[in-house]
Amino acid sequence: MVKGSNKAADRLAKLEEQRARINAEIQRVRAREQQQERKNETRRKVLVGAMILAKVNSSEWPEDRLMAAMDAYLERDHDRALFGLPPRQKDEPG
């Protein structure tokens, strides 16, 4: 009976190792997917920005409209400074 329980324990240990390897692989695949999605999101943002700037540069979209939109959207002072916008007042709504 001891011999049978050793086989069962060995089998169980092997299955636990397999599960650990599979779980690690699942985590790696999910991490790669999340990383790729972040890259895709960043690329989409860059392309949208490029399109808007192209429209402003070709006078299809007035620059003052872009600046008004950026003024309304940007909250952090260092982001606002990139566009020559003044810092937001602390009591100013976002």
From Swiss-Prot:
UniProt keyword terms in alphabetical order: Conjugation, Mobility protein, Plasmid
Domain of life assignment: Bacteria
Described function: This protein is essential to promote the specific transfer of the plasmid in the presence of conjugative plasmids.
Self-association state and partner proteins as the record states: Interacts with MobA and MobB to form the relaxosome.
Protein's UniProt name: Mobilization protein C
